[in-house]
């Protein structure tokens, strides 16, 4: 049974024994929550998530599109694939570059 992580996301249906899973392990999530698209799932239990956001240009009073890539832990019970829209939440540093964990697959991006 998956524990409540304090976010409004659906718990995964499958079980896993990953200690770094927020639902079945002991990893606490806190901080920022982002939505993005998985652009690479080649690493073991990790994904690269690309997110687009708007940045305001004060001089011209307009917005510009920006993009950033974030590395996130991909628990086996969630198992996000390339092209999936995912919700990631901040957690403690899991490695040198990973400070986020995938908490929900919100669909698949269609081109």
From Swiss-Prot:
Which GO BP terms, alphabetically? translation
Keyword terms, alphabetized: Ribonucleoprotein, Ribosomal protein, RNA-binding, rRNA-binding
Specify whether Ribosomal protein is a keyword of the entry: yes
Q: Which GO terms describe its cellular component?
A: cytosolic small ribosomal subunit
Under the subunit heading, UniProt states: Part of the 30S ribosomal subunit.
The question of whether Transferase is a record keyword is answered with: no
What's this protein's family per the entry?
A: Belongs to the universal ribosomal protein uS17 family.
Question: Cross-referenced Pfam families, in alphabetical order?
Answer: Ribosomal_S17
Give the function comment from the record.
One of the primary rRNA binding proteins, it binds specifically to the 5'-end of 16S ribosomal RNA.
Q: Which cysteines are joined by disulfide bonds?
A: none
Alphabetical list of NCBIfam families matching this protein: PRK08572.1, uS17_arch
Concerning InterPro entries, the annotation shows: NA-bd_OB-fold, Ribosomal_uS17, Ribosomal_uS17_arc/euk, Ribosomal_uS17_archaeal, Ribosomal_uS17_CS
What is the recorded name of this protein?
A: Small ribosomal subunit protein uS17
Which SUPFAM superfamilies does the entry mention?
A: Nucleic acid-binding proteins
GO molecular function annotation: rRNA binding; structural constituent of ribosome
């Amino acid at each position: 049974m998956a524990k409540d992580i304090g976010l409004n996301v659906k718990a995964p249906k499958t079980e896993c024994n990953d200690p770094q899973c927020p639902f079945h392990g002991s990893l606490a999530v806190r901080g920022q929550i982002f939505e993005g698209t998985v652009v690479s799932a080649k690493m073991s239990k990790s994904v690269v998530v690309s997110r687009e956001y708007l940045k305001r240009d004060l001089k011209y009073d307009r917005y510009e599109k920006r993009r950033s890539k974030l590395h996130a832990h991909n628990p086996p019970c969630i198992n996000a694939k390339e092209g999936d829209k995912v919700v990631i939440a901040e957690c403690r540093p899991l490695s040198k570059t990973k400070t986020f964990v995938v908490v929900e697959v919100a669909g698949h991006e269609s081109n």
